[in-house]
Amino acid sequence: MAQGSGSASQAKFWVALLFCFLFFWENVDAATYTVGGSNGWTFNMATWPRGKRFRAGDTLLFEYDATIHNVVAVNRGGYRSCITPAGAKVYKSGKDEVKLGKGMNYFICNIAGHCESGMKIAINAV
């Protein structure tokens, strides 16, 4: 009986280890992108995502002057209209890290006139 009990304990250990591996695997492959590159989060951002392959779990790093800009995670309507929906998450540290969810992710600066001047991005994470 002792041998059977040991085998069950070993099996539980390996199953737990497998779950840990699978849980952390997604983050191992995650990338971090500095939005806007060396220019940071600024105006005329529409072309910045082109040519990049974003995945769910990747991180966007928004670097900007927090005294004049912010970052707001919005829905498609907020992105198109440059209007912040109720309950939208507003980031304002000047160095914000945002993890991408699967599908479309939309971000704007909601300081008056900034979104309308191209301070917005739409990212599709696969």
Where are these regions (language model features)?
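N-terminal V-set
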Residues: L60-R80
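Short alpha-helix capping/helix-loop boundary micro-motifs
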Residues: W41-R50
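Extracellular/periplasmic metallocenter environments
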Residues: A2-A16, F21-W41, T67-H69, R80-V126
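Short secondary-structure boundary/capping segments within folded domains
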Residues: G51-K52, F62
